Amino acid sequence: MLRDVIESYVPFCEQEEVDRREILRLMDTGMDLMHRDFPAHFSASAWVVSPDREHILMAHHRIYHAWSWLGGHADGEEDLLSVAVREVQEECGASRVRVASPKILSLEILPVQGHVKRGVWVSSHQHLNLTYLLEVSRDEQVHAREEENTAVRWFTLSEAETVPEEAWMCEQVYAKLNRRLRSFP
């Protein structure tokens, strides 16, 4: 099922076409990419917008010390849309998360630097990431999840491309998501 979703995805740009081919190649190796035990594994992210699509909900990530989109590891779950919804609910406490579209918003291979998580070293690895467009009302009560992030807040679309402290993510991912958002159903 996941392979069919990725094969049928129409890339938005050259980066997505190249990354899509690499993800499909990795899937052909027979490695278990659904669990984080491997140096490349699936993750799901959410570009969480307000219903008017003027604001993005982001969390200040505890490990990266930066404002970031919401999401997490597949951990064996092949339905990455469900993973994205669950992660939004867990990471910001939103109870009313609406799937704006079941289609993939974007696809990317994300490099993850080695880091310490819960006192244990996690080696550098790659996230084979699918991003989905989700909606949360700005009236919804959201809050930080202490073990994952230190704060949660809304940003305008332009702020989402400039405020986060990770320049690569701003330039290569968040700006792309905003461009894609303008033409996404």
Which sequence ranges carry the predicted segments?
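Unchanged
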Residues: D75-W168
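Charged phosphate-binding loop/patch that engages nucleotide di/tri-phosphates or the phosphate backbone
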Residues: E165-P185
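Alpha-helical structural motif
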Residues: M1-L2, D19, L128, M169
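Generic N-terminal amphipathic, Lys/Arg-enriched alpha-helix
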Residues: M1-V10
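N-terminal strand-loop-strand
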Residues: M34-W69
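Acidic, metal-coordinating catalytic segment for phosphate/diphosphate chemistry
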Residues: V10-S45
